[in-house]
């Protein structure tokens, strides 16, 4: 394993909540910029709004970190209640992804929009139907891969990276639409 990868794994293992905050703050803003570049829509955040937006993304990273831990425990409890004693890691990852994106995902997305509205002084929930649909065609497959990783510490960072990918896909779709 390369030195930088090992350094990353050490940092996210040692400081999981701080790492979740920073990863989402940085990658969330990068996703906003990529989506705006693809759609041709200019982002005009002053420094104060920029910091508020980063704060919002960072808080979302903390919520996702806790949500992933909770959904892992939930999936283990379902296995226990159904007396599933064996099964593939991929099955567990798929079930955890399905539970996460069915029970946790919609509320997290609505919270994220509410938080954006609050921090940026905007209103509205336009486009939430499209966002919710991504849970099934994008996030369940993406998180199945994410949750199949043996190192749970890197899952939040990968989720933040998946957000960049989704932003790019949606930006291209909006541009063509």
Question: What are the residue ranges of the model-derived segments?
Answer:
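Juxtamembrane/disordered regions of integral membrane proteins
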Residues: 1-177
């Amino acid at each position: 394993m390369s030195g930088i990868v090992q350094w990353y794994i050490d940092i996210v293992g040692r400081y999981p909540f701080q790492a979740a905050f920073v990863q989402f703050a940085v990658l969330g803003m990068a996703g906003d910029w990529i989506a705006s570049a693809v759609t041709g829509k200019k982002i005009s955040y002053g420094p104060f709004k920029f910091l508020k937006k980063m704060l919002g993304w960072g808080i979302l990273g903390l919520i996702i970190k806790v949500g992933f831990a909770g959904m892992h425990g939930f999936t283990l409890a379902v296995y226990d209640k159904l007396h599933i004693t064996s099964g593939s890691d991929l099955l567990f990852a798929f079930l955890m992804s399905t539970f996460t994106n069915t029970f946790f995902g919609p509320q997290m997305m609505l919270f994220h929009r509410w938080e954006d509205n609050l921090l940026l002084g905007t209103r509205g929930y336009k486009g939430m139907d499209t966002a919710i649909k991504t849970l099934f065609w994008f996030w369940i497959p993406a998180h199945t891969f994410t949750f199949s990783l043996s190192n749970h510490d890197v899952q939040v960072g990968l989720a933040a990276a998946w957000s960049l990918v989704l932003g790019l896909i949606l930006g291209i779709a909006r541009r063509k639409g």
